[in-house]
Amino acid sequence: MTETLKARLEFPNSLIQAQAVRTLVAAVLKEKGQNEKICQTSTKGPALESLWEQCSSDSTVVRSACCNALVLLVEQGHADLPYVLNTTLNLLPSARNVQGLIKVVGRLLQIQAGQRENRASFTCPYSIRSFPHPYITVLENRPDCWPALLQEIDDFLQLATDKDEPVFVEMLVPFLRYLYCEPQRLSENALLRQSLLRVLLQPREAPESDRLEEKGASSTRVVRELIRSLFDLLPHMLVDSVTAVVELSSFAESLTAALISHPELWRKELTRLALQLLCACQLTIHLGGELMSLLHTLHHIIPAHAEELPAEQVIMGISLLLLNASVSQQTALLDLAVKIVPPELPPPWGASLLVMPLLHVLSCSSLMEALTDTQTHTKNQKLANSLLQTVQREPARRKEDSMQLDLPLSTWYSELQVAVSVLHRVSTDSTSSSEWLYSLQSSLSVCENVPDTVCLLVSHLIFRSDGDLCRLALETAAAIAEADPAKVPCLLPVLMFKLSRVSDPALSLSVLYTLPKLGTHKLCIPQVLHVLQTVGSSSRLRPVALRLLALLWKKQDRVYPDLQRLMCQLDKSSVVMGKDTQWEQILARAACVRDICRERPYQHGGDMLAAIRDTLLQFSRKDQATPVALALQALQELCRAEVVDICSTWKALSPKLLSDTRPLVLKATAELLALVPDLNVKTEEYEKFGSEAVGVLWGYALSQDSVVASQGFKALSEYPESSHTILHLPEQARPIPKQPEVEDEVKQNEEENEEEEDISVPGASYVKLVSLTSLSVLPALETFLTALVRQEMKQMPRGVYHSALTGGNLRSDQGKTVSGIPSFMLKMYEKNKQPGLKPGLAAGLLLCYDLPVQTDKDGRPIIRFLVSRGRSYQQMLATFIHEVNIQPSEWHRSLLLPQAWRGFMSRAFHALLQGRKAELEMLQKQGKESPEELQYQQHYAWLWVRDRLTDVVKSAAKDSPVVQGNSILALSGLAVVLTRYESNLPAQSESGPEAGPDIFPTVHWLSMVIDTLLSIVSSNSNPKAQVFPWFVHRSYSGENTASVIARSCAALGLALLVPVLVTWRRDSIPSILGTLEAGLPGSATADESQALQFHSGLALGMFLAWLLDERVSDISGQSVAELLMKHLKRLEVCCFDPNLEYNAGCVLGVGLVLSSLSSSSQCERDRVHVSHTLDRLLQSLQDSSNNSRMMQEVVAYSVACVGVSAFSAGIIEASKAEESMNTLRALTEESQQTPGFALALGQTVFGLSSFGHGKAVDIQPRLLAAWTKILLAEGCPTMQRLSALNGLIALVGSETALIQMKSECEETSLQHSRLNEVIRAITQIITFSGTIGLQSNGACLLGHLHLTHASSRHSRTAVPQDFGYLSESSVIRASVDFITEAGRKGPEFTAPQRVKTLLSALAAVGADFQYPPVNWSSVLSPLMRLGFGEEVQHYCLELAASQTQSSQSASLFLGVWLVPPLVHSLSLRTRAHLYESLSCWMKHVAEDKLQVYVDSLAVQQFEPLTRLQRLSLCLSILHGLSRAMTAPNPPQNCWSVLCSTAEKIYNLLPDSIPAAEVALYEAMCSCLSEMSDAEIDRIVKVSEANVEKTAFILSYLVSKGRVPLLGLNDVISTILQVGSKRPISWLLLQGLHQSRFASGPNTGVSKRMEWLLELMGHIRNVAYGSPSVKCVDVLQGTDFLLGVFAAAVVSWADHGGPLLVGIRARWFPWPQSAELCHGLYANPEDTELPVASCLLAIPYSIRKLLDKEPWKSQSQKFIDWLFSITEAPKQAFSETAVLTAKAALMALRSSSEFKKKTVWTRAYGW
């Protein structure tokens, strides 16, 4: 610039300066050239530089001219507009004066706005961030230039108005968005914001318009665009401070004024603005600002637009604001409410929400009257009362709210929407209301701050509902008060208001009794107390008020003076009242005294003593017992707390109480005396008092009044047993005094009685009370007996358990007699000098020979005696082989010999094995053998024993036929023993010594035994291997030369080998059966020998019977049942063929097979067959007069076998069994010298009596006496004595080892005494009788008796048969004896209710204790089989189940009843109990029984047709399974059964959850939760069909923290593939919410956050079509997934959201209710509504979620994810979903991440 030009520009004359500028512009044009354009890339000359410099000149003329020149250059095309604009903006930060530059910017923007073509739509080229608006740049770089900018914008808008160009406004929009919506809200821009608002909305006219119409039109277009632009800014404005509230208020006020100028044009906008202002009001209250300006603005909007407003939202909003507003603010809000709820029209639907706020306003108004302006107070009162009257009227019909805010100012609007949606839900029907209230109650326990919206909804339900729903709402209100006491002042007026409107007395009482429950905080007490005092001001309501005040006092002790005052008012009241009212006051006062003494006896009990005394003395009439009883209850509490001394109290009151006869008073007195044991003091005086109390209570217990008697027994149950004496008992229950036999004893007893008389009560006397007590008192007596049994078990010495099992405490004559038989027989054998007696003694000794093990002083066996004991057995083996006689004609001996030899060989094998190991131990100590050799010999000692015993048999085998027969049976017995021993050996370990060449393998040895026996029996046998060559049985021609006895014994030996064959040669069984069948009478291949035919039939029967015992299902692919029936039919053909001569063995065989079939088969066909064949046998017996004696005997014996077994198995009735018994009895009486008849009769009577057959029980003692007399009578014929001997032996159970009875058939103590009596009689015969035949048979039968009692499957002497070893004072002993006797006599003699009383007592204690050893099956079996009823059966099995842990007999007994057919006779209640107690007994019963009862029968109950009828049983099954699976360390077999059963039941449960079967699914979850994760994944596989079932199961397990949240992913994926189903989202919602409360690693906050982020990624993948995701309908899928996301966010954000929505804190928050039509969903049709509410709550909840750690750190990820929804393809998300995402983004605008410009501009779409 030249100095001349510079001087001109600085010359202070405008003309000169203008010329200078003109010259400068000419210079610029000259510099640029003719066709060039000034732009960024052109050369910048000095003239242009000067021009730019002068644009910021201090001279207004120069500056203005230069700026105009720049704009002119652009307009004329000499300069590039972007270049000029950018250069201007660059100069601004450093410019001395910015007015001109800002003018340039404005002119350039005008040029840009005017460049559009022919009215084409205009889009502003600028934004906020990417291409920032020039004004934004100006403001950010020079904030101080806002006045110039304001002036320029004013000019800009005026120009727009003049030119009628609304696009000019569009050009300003980015700047306006930045200025008003920028989240930082810079304070330096505040003045600009306020000033610009006035500029923007000031009236503008177009002065150059020629006509008025054109003038109005032009101004309207620009102003309308301005108003719309400003209105669009409102939702995006951040209000986070009081300053922001003020600005917003001003903004809204100005905008409202503009909108109201044309209300018809802006109807929707005004409605939305009203809702936004409502949100602004809430923000203002929250921030502590002033509402009046906003409310003033609302008042301008609402009158004209009340119809368009969503009434429920506005009412809800006003209600919430009223609860938190000040008195002055309440006035404006009430005015607002009146406009929404005008008094002249029906109130809008939902207006009752205002009830609680209005009552709150009235309460505040009353309290604040003195501090409030009179006018304001009056107006508030008037408005509130008017509104209260209006909202009580019937509301108008609900209108659908069409108007909703998509982007509200505050997330509070989201809460409003949720609350309104819940209001709609709970208003549809009572089911939805109840479900929401129950859900609310379940969640209140974890919530400290209850949202006001929840209180509004509850108060609405209280106000609008009646009956049960109202009561439920009242309960919920009380729960709210407990959780958040701050809500009490609002709830209390609602209750009082409801009380004033209720006409139902019951509901009024419910409301009244809710009032004290609101006293949950000391600051709430005055308000509640005032209400109760108001109620008490009425004399008729005073009793109720007293009870209410007492309830309040229980919660808050501070109201005790008021309670006392009201009680005193009752005493001193002078008001005349009716008798009923007076009586109510008396009762209320007495009840309060009782409650005070019960609740806080230490603090206030002393104050009540006078009242108690007065009550006891004042009310003595019969109709005044109630207050006395209440006073005694109060006294009881004081004594319990030891406020008063019970002993002194009794002394003072006993004269009056003992003379009282009123049942209610006596009952209360008994309750008082029940405390005596607990308050025991060790003084003589107290002991006397205790004795007196016991006497009084026994007097009550024996009262004729059932109430008094019952309470007497209950009180006595608190006393120790030692307190009772026989003097307390009635005469009938006292023990009968023992009569001494001689005079000396009388004198001695008198002397002892003088010293001390024993007046303790025997247990039997207590039990006698059961028979003497009336049925109505039996439950109380049961309590008393239970207490006695429990005391006895607690004091039971430990030693009893051991000594009972070892016999140390057995009665002197019990057990020892049987165990003394072997020593007696050995002694007789050694002393015997009569050759004729030797075989009988040898046979008897074979059956019972057993040498005791000699021990040292420490109880350890003496080694050398073990060695000699083994040698003794070897010697006796050789002796028995030679001396035991075998007579084929003695059929009973043939039955005994196989078992005799098996038993002896077992004892010999184990004795010799002990001896061998002892011998090797001695050698080891002596060091005579190497350790390796000794180890080898020790390892194979059992094979050494086998070979040693085999050598003994070998050395004797070549002798006579009898010796050969014994050798064969001994060899067979050894094979059986060897097989059983080897099967119990542990598996051969690799480290064990290998067998040397001297060891003959067991399998080969056993094969030799089998083949040897087959070769002896049949000539056609072809041995597979070598045989023992000791028996010469084949001639050179191949004929069988073995003796008849040897062949007969070999046949029996084959039957004995059944266990061996089943283990080693199962495929040989059919051929062996064929071999034995070939020897049957009538067969073409049968031998001519009578003995061989007999033994073939007997051996075949034994074989089949023992094969049944092995429980084998199939042999070589053939069913054992088919094989059995095939050969049984052949045996029966021979048995019943009258033309066969030697078929006695077949008859015995049939009897043995049918006996075994009775006990083992559960097939109805088999049971029918047994019954039918028994009839045929009985008929044969009755028609057998022409048969041989032997044939008659074996038929009788078979009838006895089958009859007893069939009766024990329930196949035949008692009448049929009695017919058999009578037939045998008649035959025995006719032929008294036939031993077989007596044997059969004795066996029948014993068997039937063991199972409770009454007639058999009666006959047994008479037969015993008669036969004993005959046996001991030397003058009787020998055969008659022999018959008596056989009958006696059978009468005490000798044959139970031969026949099959159910395993619970056990002897009783009475049978033991009979057994001992018989043994003594027989030993007397053997010792002293001169009849050798009788002695010989007696010796054999005595040994048989010992074998029977020593070798049964469960030894009858293993445990005592009763509790006789306990003292006579034992109640347990007496109870069991009573039960046993009842089982003998049957229900005809003992009432089932009385049996149940004792059983129930034993079962109750048995659940906690294991009783001392006793044979439970012998005790309980008769009760089960006789008609005592289902209840007795139930307690029998309950008792047995509880004792299985320590009692094998209980386990066996229980096992019999767990399988068909008996299990089907049990009641459903009993079966349910067995399932529920499964964990107690599952380890102790046989595996097959457990398998049947649990894995088979339990699963059957879940079949569709059965399950519906037996839901309770099914539930018990699942509960039992769950408990059993919870048990620590269950055995593997049990665990397998439990898991298998649970899986099968799971598969049978319906895929859709039925309404009444929800509990089954919950119980199934408990079972699954005990399994491993892998098992759960395998069983719970999600499919389209079972998606509802699996969704519930997995949601439930997730809610308990059992499986991770990832377990829900399969459900979600399945829904995406098959389409959404209604209840699934709801199920996931509950599971996600409840998982928050689960403890464990699976549902911790980090796991939940990880899962939610993964879900968000999954939603993104579905929306954007990721190939890894399968989804049939993207839009439907994303809606479902967003629902799941909303469920998680609402559930985990805070506790208020779930509370409002009604999400449950537990799955089943309500009791069983007929109102709720579904056990899980309550109302299946509404399951989507809570999820929809969650979607509405996303903006509200997501903000709360991301405000806390660790979620806060993930805010950016949530924001990015929300962007992925708002910017997703249109087909990916519904419009609602996109709006929800935008609202959620807006909710986060307070976060630091959102305030980044890149984020908020993107979120706003700018």
Curated annotation (Swiss-Prot):
Pfam families: DUF3730, Focadhesin. Residues 733-760 are annotated as: Disordered. InterPro entries: ARM-type_fold, FOCAD/RST1_DUF3730, Focadhesin/RST1, Focadhesin_C. Its main location: other. The keyword Cytoplasm applies. One of its GO terms (biological process) is regulation of post-transcriptional gene silencing. One of its GO terms (cellular component) is cytosol. It is found in: Cell junction, Focal adhesion; Cytoplasm, Cytosol. Keywords: Cell junction, Cytoplasm. Disruption phenotype: Gene knockdown results in decreased overall survival and growth retardation. Mutant fishes have pathological liver features, including swollen hepatocytes, steatosis, fibrosis, and hepatocyte apoptosis. Required for the maintenance of SKIC2 and SKIC3 proteostatic levels in the liver. May be involved in the regulation of RNA degradation by the exosome complex. This is Focadhesin. It comes from Danio rerio. The gene is focad.
